[in-house]
């Protein structure tokens, strides 16, 4: 089959094609355009184009006139009258034939009187043009106002048809001149231009916005952009004719450009992102070619790979599968548009603010810059800032208490993240996980309407977090590894490449891929999963966090910094800037003999400590929840300083916390999780060790009957008594002194951190109300600490497994230890009643409190099951309190085991009150079957179903 010539190919698509072509092409070419042809805009536009074509194509005016006359008479003729076509001259055969365009035009004329014709706007805004949305032509347009987009008319006006030979010749000459020895001058000029642009005040994130400079810079930019566009066109033509030569020349030119004009992109209304701001990120998230190489991330990457004129394998940045930097740089993947409607990448003229620092005027929290390109298609920029506020929101104005149930303790300073000019430099994975945690409970309208919005957004943020983290494999990403990477990873006959072990990790120092930010990201993922119904799956994330923390040696203090003599003109206040803006991920280094010369800020040191102690506490807490041995040992952190007071930490007063003890604490020292809950977890670790030693299949019985057992139990009991005394001293210090007005001993506790935790605290509350709230907060902490302390007494003396407790094969209920444990069970119930008084919805520590409420209730269930109507009034009141507490827990943090035990306890309480059902035996058997789901004996996994 021969290929048709160009005139034949063109005439087959002409509105005045010959009869043979029309009959063959009309049915197939107009099927997809039937609905489009019915619209008045389309028909009128095609009518005007056909008239212009007829006027220019005819030889004289008579021909044009006869053509118009013949077309005006065709509305009364049959659509395909072959006899008429044959009798007509061949020169006018196209015009006399009835075609779909004329039919559609006739239909429009018939209905034009009933339907008003909407006036066509001359130009749509950049957003509507890129989104293919109808625009009203206003500035700003209605569409941009409705969706909060930036309405601009900055894109380049393009003309239809081929470029003129004069323009192509000029472009080729410019490209030839640039490739014949002028690359050095181009480098110098471009680098000088970049240096001058970087030093301008409009580009500084800390500086003020200069509108005069902005207008001048934008007005002078189109000419430069036109030159770059011309050079790009010529480079593309040369790449098709001489690939090897053009590739080298283009690579030199683009390297010289250094991403000067395309280092910020604003795709589909998403915020721009500066490449220079990404140089400090860990290598795990950086592009494989580095940020200085502009070959794959240059202006030529904006060419749409689906266009027929673009190269096949070069300059493609739209496909995330072929180039992992596409989502990192904020480009929309081509998969967003269907194959039948290819949307070209936006023209460089769509980005008028290339040289300006991104987000300088719109981003409330610049700390979000690394993650904004990834979340632009998930949540708005304003919502991301609001979610960051939610993450750091405190439920109390007197002392720090995270409002989100999934934020178990503050690892980072709020001021470091929310600083307007010098925020903490964070990995995108950490920021995405923080937004994901906050989105679980945020009441933003974007997440609540429709009801499925929260689940959809949270799922996308979760997938993004895991994708940015690359879990469990801290090695080169896809495309980062060199061709001989696998060969290099065979060391001493062992292949290490598959485990993500890079060469620098085999030395004294760990690479920056295993950073503190990654550990915190694991903690966020594990916390939310632990609070869900998939508790067993959370151990994967906790194990990763514990392993990476141990690898980074977070349980050890870093060596002291090298002292440098302060310059004469250096101010003493520079330390505050260093505290707010620490070096990038320097905390991932610092173990080994070669790290003594690394300077680490005190804030980074405290972040390492708080992260370790949080993992230390959750390790012991989950050992009780899931009936598993400890992972992090006391000897690993024997020389680590205890975490500082949360109020001092948020203020940044490191000098006031200079004198601290080392090692795991056993006394209550503060209102935060680190102050009252961490000491309890230290004691719980000893109880867990005793429990597993007692139940050891070989040595358990001998150890249980040895004097060493009694000594260990006495040691743990002494620690619990020490904690009880410190709890009373803590209550007296923060209630009696505040009541008497003697607040000199703790000057920073009252309102010192209100500047950054509750902005309206000072203006809306009086000193008296803050003192009252501080007293209530202190008593609530004491109530929680008292309850958990009683539960630890029960765990030390009693049985953990509810089925073994109810069956009582060894007659433990007749022993003295049972009487002691029962008294602690009643005391725990009384503390729970006090907790419900100060915290009715149990929202103070819902993540931790559930298991201690459950373990403290087993003995009361045993008493209700055995004694029934003979139970004492104190036991009945304790059972009622436990039922109310479980109902409150179900409302705050709904989990299956709490709902199940509430039903079991409610059934037992009904029997105590004399309401014994007819199937009493079946009720007892059903309770045991339900409790058998949660076993702490043998190979039982506790709450991890």
UniProtKB/Swiss-Prot annotation:
Result of knocking out the encoding gene? Reduces growth on birchwod xylan, while growth is unaffected on D-xylose, xylitol and other carbon sources like D-glucose, L-arabinose or L-arabitol.
Q: Does the keyword Heme apply?
A: no
One of the entry's Gene Ontology molecular-function terms is: DNA-binding transcription factor activity, RNA polymerase II-specific
| Its job | Transcriptional activator of the xylanolytic system. Involved in the regulation of extracellular cellulolytic and xylanolytic genes and in the regulation of the intracellular activities of D-xylose catabolic genes in the pentose catabolic pathway (PCP) in response to the presence of D-xylose. Binds to the DNA sequence 5'-GGNTAAA-3'.
List, as start-end ranges, the regions of compositional bias called Polar residues.
176-188
What is the scientific name of the source organism?
Aspergillus niger
Which SMART domains does this chain map to? Answer: Fungal_trans, GAL4
The reply to whether Metal-binding figures as a keyword in the UniProt entry is yes
The protein here is known as Xylanolytic transcriptional activator xlnR
The biased composition feature labelled Low complexity covers 1-23
